[in-house]
Curated annotation (Swiss-Prot):
Transferase in keyword set: yes
PANTHER family linked: HISTONE-LYSINE N-METHYLTRANSFERASE ASH1 (PTHR46147:SF3)
Protein name per Swiss-Prot or TrEMBL: Probable histone-lysine N-methyltransferase lin-59
Role played: Probable histone methyltransferase. Essential protein required to maintain expression of homeotic genes egl-5 and mab-5. May play an analogous role to the trithorax Group (trxG) proteins. TrxG proteins form multiprotein complexes that are required to maintain the transcriptionally active state of homeotic genes throughout development. May act via a modification of chromatin.
Tissues in which the protein is found: Widely expressed throughout embryonic development and into adulthood.
Record field: compositional bias (Basic residues): 383-394
Region (Disordered): 1-41, 54-81, 154-223, 312-435, 524-556, 913-934, 1248-1295
Domain BAH: 1100-1223
């Protein structure tokens, strides 16, 4: 095979004559006449046209000779005057190469066959070659292949040259010296042409004039189909060549010859076989009649089997269409489908593109050509280096489908006026219609949605394994984690359902191509679905988190329609506030700010500027897991409920427990102006109209959510806050304290209503009146005649009163070159906005501090001192005494005033102060500058009772109880009442069962011999059996349940005793040495961590040294040389080496705070510094309490001196600059029952008047609680602004009232 460069072009014989076009009934009538003589139906035969490169001279000589025979055959002759040209020639140098192609002949009905045939016998490898020339008289040589026989066919002179395909339909490879090899022989199912009498046809004779080609079939490429191919035509084959005895005669396909008697079924003769025979051209009724006449039961079984096979084939076809991955539909080419003609080149492998969709008609030659076409494509694929394409099989349909398709085909044939009369007697077979591009795209879309759903489900499973959450704490209850996981999976399932419902768009597009009956059926289904949905309550929907974040933009502010009527039309349900008109939107808009956070999740008010100013972060926040987006949590329906009852007694309650500071819901309604609020409130006196700004109100009377049922209380458990969300002001309800399930939510509506209203809340501190918004707006129509110099100020006041919300100065861009004064103004504006009320007013107690800072900025010029500025704010914050505002100021100060500004001013000031000291030191011997700790005043740590001077456990000797008492005295030394406890029948103290079981188990033999238990079940503790050292606890108690994560080969204890005789108990505080040894770190480095149930692969080869057992003396240590340590774990490693693990507490002088900060001498601060120390480093015991317990009383046992009892309310960070309150989970409460705790007659007060770095300058007005930290360590300002003048608020208010009265008197006199 000479493979390279060979090309083959397929052609098809088309029964296309003028008679058929102009007189379609002629061929039908002729066919009916010939049907009486039992016309033979011929199957198309494949013919291969071979070509070889020839020289120009040879072409010329051959064309001029005119009468040469074919080079590969015998017994035939050439006709010089009739040339059939197929394609265009290609000239390569001196050679002319004609393209090779495959011809498919199908003789039309009634068309005579006049060609001559030359038969060549031989093997399947026989090749007949011929030279074709672009111009000449040499006819083409056709090499036809059928049943291992090879023929050479010469067409008659009636074949027109105009019937050739256009030049674009054929192609050849410009490669000389290449010979084409015919395709493989067709399958044996292909029938040969029958011997037909030529004389039966009306042949037209040639004359000397131009040839008449009207009765000849046209030669047309397969790729260029025409409308005439819609109806296949049967034809008779040409007369056989009598000179070739190898040709066998086969009857027509319309009549099947009787088989021999031996091949008939048992019990059937030839007559019965003829009556039962079913031919392909029989009528349906005839087939059914024969089946029913033979065996009715068998006919029914055959019909059922046909239906089953049809259903299976249809299902396979749908599955095959659904799994198509290409975006362009590749359908089997059918008759009546126009395709683009493309040159078959080596690089052309793209499928045909369907441009129009016509009904596909059955063909008598389709099934016979499928196999050979596959063989041709396999050969082509091997030559081109690609795999052959798979073809789909043809499916059978049921009788009902056959009838419907037959009717459709008849109707289409009648409409198109196609010459189908000649084919009326053939059976109708059904071929699957071509794939519609729209349906194909819909199928691809459905397949992509299924894939997307699978990927989403897989991604959700992977994400749940990662355990991503906004919470940074790893201590999460398993039940809570399971609930969150279920909620997350539920949200993903709902999102996947929405994706599946996305096919509605495809159905809408498909409606354009629906018929009226399809639309009516779809409407009926929709009506049924709506009826079903109305009969069942709608399920609760969980909204997805990620989509709701990204889709909430300011452009969403529209006036939506009411969602649903609630409580019999009492109000319309909406999810968020909406404007009442378009005129409200400009007044409602709020400026947007950027928090500038680069790490974390915007969770702290001390770090995030937006959270400090009550601004919700937008989607442009630089932090990837920003949690400052409270208002997108629209879960009011899941965590809140409205109690049933009359209209006036409905209240809003919680379904589950809520924590302090948690967002509960949004107070939604219509946003209206002040005038509209006054009009509505005057009519209804409804307290649901709430102010969100000086001139804006939210009306929750007609359109709102369940927040409208929140009641007023003078002692509320929640509060209303106004936040800037996506550029608009929205009101939210936040919890003030921890709320239990089924707790009523109440807020204080003072200064929020349009007018005053009577209060009947029933609280113990009820004010009896709910104050309305105070209107401090001047009348713009007021005329000022006499005092003209204040007209400008009056107008400015009127203009400022109309503005509310975030100050515009906060939007000024900041850079390093900005002036310090501008930054200070921004700090003042931001903090003033934070301390103002919702209506824009400021408390009278804050006005003196506010005016003092404004005066400072005006008098100090362009470069005011930042240290003095910060100190003024410190005094203001001490007067406010609000932890939320303190944290907000830290965030505002750190954002607008960087620490570099403060540090630079501080260094310049210290340089001036230390200049004389430096000169004095330079004259004498050089000495180092005293450290900060050395500069601090440590006299507050001095005491008459140093550490180790007394034993707190001495109080156990006098501690007693009675039989009915609940006092606890356990060998572990702990006083908590957790777990199961047992009471001693001798001393009547209660003990922990876990602790006692360990001691009983370890001393089982001693107890059996000395004091066995009585038969009555009495229990006698170790204190009564003298196993303890007196009446004080002194034992090592091991934990019954070891921790899950622990060191290898280590045991963990509840209490341990060191060599000094001090019993160290879990969760208690002790003193440790300030200077610690380093020897124990080698053992700690060789300890390997393990989890419960896991095994180490290799053993630990490190040998732990044995611990010393000699007792250590108790030393007296000053407190300034010791540190306070919180015990969190006690363990013993191999060699009886005992260790304690915990965290340190910091003294006030160990924190980095400014000199203006005041402390309490009994105050310590929790730190994040953890350490593992030897147990022998514990030198004493102390007690650290929370503020409430410290003020309440002291424990009876162990009894500490007052110098060893401390309070802890704040904790500091690693930098020791940021102070915040200790969270509840890090607090360590003690037993405050009366049997072990003594309360004070008058509770103590925390006095903060101590400054460790400036003892000579105490605070003029000590606040009640601790103040906030500063971002840097600064010295006290030395300026006249330190002393804040005392302001008598009573006198100030009296003066203000007098001025108001005078103004009213003047206005009244003018009007009169």
């Amino acid at each position: 095979m000479h493979g390279a460069g060979e090309q083959q072009q397929r052609y098809r014989y088309n029964a296309r004559s003028d008679e058929q076009h102009h007189h379609p009934s002629t061929s039908s009538h002729q066919y009916q006449q010939q049907g009486a003589r039992q016309m033979h139906q011929m199957h198309p035969i494949q013919a291969t046209l071979m070509c070889t490169p020839t020289t120009t001279s040879a072409a010329a000589s051959t064309s001029s000779s005119g009468g040469s025979n074919s080079s590969g055959g015998s017994g035939g002759h050439r006709q010089q005057g009739n040339i059939l040209r197929i394609g265009n020639s290609i000239k390569i140098g001196d050679n002319i190469l004609e393209p090779a192609g495959t011809l498919v002949f199908s003789q039309a009905d009634g068309t005579p066959w006049t060609g001559q045939r030359i038969v060549v016998n031989g093997s399947t490898h026989a090749v007949v070659k011929a030279n074709l020339f672009p111009i000449g008289t040499t006819p083409p040589v056709l090499n036809m292949q059928s049943n291992q026989n090879w023929y050479m066919n010469q067409p008659s002179g009636t074949v027109p040259m105009s019937s050739n395909a256009p030049a674009t339909t054929s192609s050849a490879t410009p490669d000389s010296g290449i010979q084409s090899v015919p395709t493989s022989p067709p399958s044996p199912s292909y029938a040969m042409m029958n011997d037909v009498d030529i004389g039966d046809h009306d042949d037209e004779e040639d004359d000397d004039g131009p040839a008449d080609f009207t009765d000849m079939p046209l030669l047309k490429p397969v790729d260029e189909d025409d409308d005439c191919y819609d109806v296949p035509c049967t034809s008779e084959g040409p007369p056989p060549n009598n000179s070739n005895p190898a040709i066998t005669t086969i009857p027509s396909s319309c009549s099947t010859p009787a088989p021999p008697k031996e091949s008939l079924p048992t019990g059937m003769n030839v007559e019965e076989w003829g009556s039962f025979l079913i031919a392909s051209n029989m009528d349906r009724e005839e087939i059914v009649r024969r089946l029913m006449a033979h065996d009715p039961e068998m006919a029914k079984a055959i019909a059922m089997r046909i239906r089953e096979l049809s259903a299976e084939e249809s299902k396979k076809k749908k599955d095959m269409e659904a799994e198509v991955s290409s975006t362009t539909p590749t359908t089997p080419r059918a008759r009546g489908t126009r395709t683009r003609n493309k040159c078959a080149t080596r690089s052309t492998n793209s499928p045909d593109v369907t441009t129009s969709n016509l009904p596909e008609e059955p063909s008598t030659s389709t099934m016979g050509l499928v196999k050979e076409n596959e063989d041709v494509e396999k050969v082509e694929g091997k030559r081109r280096g690609r795999k052959p394409k798979k073809r789909r099989g043809f499916h059978k349909e049921s009788f009902e489908d056959l009838e419907s398709d037959a009717k459709k085909s008849k109707a289409e044939q009648h409409e198109d006026h196609l010459p189908e009369a000649s084919c009326s007697s053939r059976p109708e077979s059904v071929i699957p219609p071509p794939v519609d591009p729209i349906q194909f795209r819909l199928k691809v879309r459905e397949m992509m949605e299924r894939k997307l759903e699978q990927l989403t489900q897989k991604m959700s499973e992977d994400m749940t394994e990662l355990r991503l959450s906004h919470l940074t704490s790893s201590k999460m209850v398993n039940g809570e984690r399971g609930k969150r996981r279920e909620s997350f999976l539920r949200q993903l399932n709902e999102q996947s359902k929405k994706l599946r419902k996305g096919g509605m768009l495809g159905r809408k597009r498909l409606r354009m191509f629906m018929t009226e009956s399809d639309i009516l059926e779809e409407n009926k289904d929709n009506i049924k679905k709506e009826v079903k949905e109305e009969s069942t309550p709608p399920p609760t929907k969980l909204r997805g988190r990620l989509p709701s974040r990204r889709t909430r933009e300011p452009s969403e502010i529209v006036n939506p329609e009411p969602v649903e009527k609630k409580f019999n039309g009492e109000y319309f349900e909406i999810t968020k506030s909406v404007p009442s008109s378009d005129d409200i939107i400009p007044l409602w808009m709020a400026p947007s700010l950027t928090c500038g956070c680069t790490k974390g999740a915007c969770t702290s008010d001390m770090d995030c500027l937006n959270r400090a100013l009550r601004v919700q972060c937008s989607s442009d926040c630089s932090v990837p897991y920003c949690s400052n987006r409270r208002f997108w949590k629209e879960d009011c329906g899941n965590k809140l409920c409205v109690s049933n009852g009359p209209r006036s007694k409905r209240v809003l309650k919680t379904k589950i427990a809520r924590r302090a500071g948690e967002f509960l819901c949004e107070y939604a309604g219509e946003v209206i102006t002040r005038e509209q609020a006054q009009e509505k409130f005057a009519q209804d006196r409804d307290p649901r109209i709430i102010a969100i700004a000086a001139h804006l109100f939210v009306d929750a009377t007609k359109r709102s959510n369940i927040a409208r049922f929140i009641k007023h209380s003078c002692k509320p458990n929640s509060r209303l806050e106004v936040w800037s969300v996506n550029g608009f002001y929205r009101a939210g309800v936040f919890a003030l304290s921890d709320l239990n399930p089924n707790a009523e939510i109440t807020v204080d509506k003072s200064d929020l209503l349009p007018f005053d209203m009577a209060c009947n809340c029933g609280a113990t501190e009820c004010k009896r009146v709910i104050r309305g918004v105070r209107w401090r707006c001047a009348d713009p129509n007021e005329k000022i005649v006499t005092r003209r110099f204040v007209i400008r100020n009056r107008r400015k006041t009127i203009e400022r009163s109309s503005h509310s919300g975030l100050p515009a100065i906060l939007q000024t861009p900041m850079d390093e070159n900005s002036s310090i004064r501008l930054k200070m103004k921004q700090v003042l504006a931001a903090f003033a906005f934070r301390v103002r009320k919702i209506d824009g007013s400021m408390s009278r107690t804050m006005l003196p501090h506010y005016t003092l800072i404004i005066k400072f900025l005006k008098t100090k010029g362009n470069n005011p001192n930042p240290v003095e500025f910060v100190s003024l704010f410190r005094k203001w914050l001490e007067a406010i005494d609000d932890d939320d505002l303190e944290r907000a100021f830290v965030a505002i100060e750190s954002h607008y005033m960087s620490s570099s500004i403060l540090s630079s001013s501080l260094q310049s000031k210290k340089a001036k102060d230390n200049a004389p000291r430096a000169r004095a030191l330079s004259t004498s011997c050089p000495s180092p500058v005293p450290s900060k700790r050395g500069d601090a005043d440590l006299s507050y740590l001095e005491s008459l009772y140093p550490i180790g001077s007394y034993d707190p456990d001495d109080a156990w000797e006098s501690y007693s109880t009675n039989k009915k008492g609940n006092a606890v005295r356990c060998i572990c030394g702990a006083l908590d009442e957790e777990g199961t406890m047992v009471q001693c029948d001798t001393c009547h103290f209660w003990l922990h069962v876990d602790c006692c079981q360990y001691v009983v188990r370890s001393n089982e033999k001693a107890q059996k011999s000395k004091n066995p238990p009585s038969d009555d079940g009495e229990y006698i503790c170790d204190f009564c059996t003298n196993k303890q050292n007196g009446l004080r606890p002194s034992a090592d108690v091991k934990l019954t349940e070891q921790p899950d994560v622990r060191f290898e080969n280590c045991d963990y204890y509840r209490s341990l005793i060191n060599r000094r005789g001090i019993q160290v108990v879990l969760n208690e505080t002790v003193y440790v040495n300030r200077v610690l040894p380093e020897d124990h770190k080698a053992m700690l480095r060789n300890l390997r961590e393990e989890k419960k149930g896991s095994k180490q692969k290799d053993t630990n080869k490190y040998r732990f040294p044995k611990a010393a057992t000699s007792p250590l003396p108790i030393e007296k240590v000053d407190r300034k040389n010791a540190r306070i340590f919180r015990v969190e774990r006690l363990f013993v490693c191999p060699g009886n080496n005992r260790f304690v693990f915990g965290s340190f507490y910091a003294w006030p002088h160990e924190t980095y705070a400014d000199a203006g900060r005041v402390f309490s001498k009994k105050e310590v601060f929790a730190t994040p510094y953890y350490e593992t120390l030897p147990l022998d480093e514990v030198i004493g015991r102390c007690l650290v309490l929370d503020t409430a317990t410290w003020c309440k009383g002291r424990p009876k046992v162990p009894k500490f001196k007052e110098d060893d009892v401390f309070l802890c309310e704040m904790q500091i960070g690693k930098t020791q600059r940021v102070f915040e309150k200790v969270p509840p989970k890090n607090r360590y409460p003690i037993n405050t029952n009366s049997y072990v705790f003594t309360e004070f007659t008058h509770p103590k007060k925390v006095v903060r008047d101590f400054r460790p770095y400036d003892p000579s300058n105490p605070s003029p007005k000590p606040p009640k609680t601790s103040s906030i930290p500063s971002t840097s360590s600064i010295d006290p300002p030395q300026s006249s602004s330190d002393g804040l003048p005392e302001v008598d608020t009573k006198k100030l208010s009296k003066r203000h009232i007098q001025r108001v009265l005078k103004r009213l008197v003047k206005n009244g006199s003018r009007r009169s």
